[in-house]
Design a protein with these regions (language model features):
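Extended amphipathic alpha-helical interaction segments
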Residues: 129-253
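Short, structured motif recognition centered on aromatic/hydrophobic residues
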Residues: 53, 66-67, 121-135, 143, ...
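A cross-kingdom marker for long, charged
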Residues: 50-51, 209-302
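C-terminal motif of bacterial Sec signal peptides marking the signal peptidase cleavage site
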Residues: 30-33
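Mid-chain, structured segments of secreted extracytoplasmic proteins
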Residues: 80-119
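Bacterial signal peptide processing site
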Residues: 35-37
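Start-of-domain marker
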Residues: 39-78
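N-terminal secretory signal peptides that target proteins for export/translocation
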Residues: 1-17
Length: 302
């Protein structure tokens, strides 16, 4: 269950490999509280290296210096080229929020955000390629080990080894948390609806888990191939571009692609259905929250 725009953004940008984590550089705006948004975004390159890249790769000083320089360039591009798109989306949803909304309307927002991934991945490709050319066997081994650790945490968070009822409850809890971020407190009937929508969502943990593992293995093998071949930046960038496409846009697993398309439609309809139950006060809360995000994002562009 992905309630409204928070879930749409999270579904787009919560990914499982090195590449998507790097792409999360400019997407802190979708995850931070308004009061922390500006500080978090302005420090995004350093925060990304500190919180994810170094724990997974343990960069040496030369790699760290190059990546920081590359991320600063990417960060500036993202600030000028993509933040205005996010601000426009928040503005658009703020206009829609007081009214009833349909599944197709919400899916159009999803598609608008998804479209930002193509130019973002194009800008990210040379950054990742330069880093990949410098990676050592020990760093790639460390990446695999950290993925194993991440996966244990993921299985624990989503209770993949527990009963179906406990897995469902995790989805419900996360759905309510996301919804209340935008609508404030839900009442009992709305929480019950979130639970029913989660039951009806056809979410398949095993499909998501399988794709997670595929992306991780694909990332490691691609980075290893680049590091070993040393065929230059142009070739390496092509390899990274193909990896980004497989990771973010078009999984090579046809069954998974069909599943994602189905889930998108279901989630959009679910979000519209939940929105229908909201009160005028809840919609006003959403409008105020959206406008606050929009204002902070536009301030970041200046």
């Amino acid at each position: 269950m992905f309630p409204f725009i928070a879930g749409i953004i999270n579904q787009l940008h919560t990914r499982f490999a090195l590449i998507p984590k790097l792409l999360a550089l400019g997407l802190l705006v979708s995850l931070s509280a308004c009061s922390l948004l500006i500080t978090g975004y302005n420090q995004a390159p350093s925060l990304l290296i500190f919180s994810w890249v170094n724990p997974h790769l343990d960069l040496n000083s030369e790699q760290d210096k190059q990546l920081r320089a590359d991320l600063q360039v990417l960060h500036q591009w993202h600030r000028q080229q993509q933040l205005p798109i996010y601000a426009d989306v928040f503005q658009k949803v703020a206009v829609l929020a007081p009214k009833e909304m349909t599944g197709p309307q919400i899916c159009s927002i999803f598609d608008e955000l998804k479209d930002t991934l193509v130019p973002l991945s194009q800008q990210m490709s040379p950054v990742i390629a330069r880093l990949a050319l410098k990676l050592t066997p020990a760093q790639l081994q460390r990446l695999e080990q950290q993925y194993d650790k991440d996966n244990k945490d993921y299985r624990k968070e989503w209770k993949l080894d527990a009963s179906a009822d406990k897995q469902l409850q995790v989805e419900v809890d996360k759905g309510i948390e996301n919804a209340e971020r935008w609508y404030d407190r839900l009442d009992k009937k709305q929480k019950a609806l979130v639970k029913q929508l989660a039951k009806d969502s056809q979410y398949d943990q095993q499909k998501s888990w399988g794709e997670r593992i595929r992306r991780q293995q694909d990332t490691v093998s691609t980075l290893e191939r680049i590091a070993k071949s040393q065929q230059g930046l142009a070739w390496s960038q092509q390899e990274v571009t193909a990896l980004l496409n497989r990771s973010l846009l078009n999984s090579p697993d046809e069954t998974y692609r069909a599943y994602v398309d189905m889930r998108k439609d279901i989630n959009c309809e679910a979000a519209a259905q939940l929105h229908t139950t909201t009160t005028a006060a809840q919609r006003e809360f959403m409008v105020k929250t959206l406008k606050a995000y929009e204002a902070d994002i536009r301030a970041l562009v200046k």
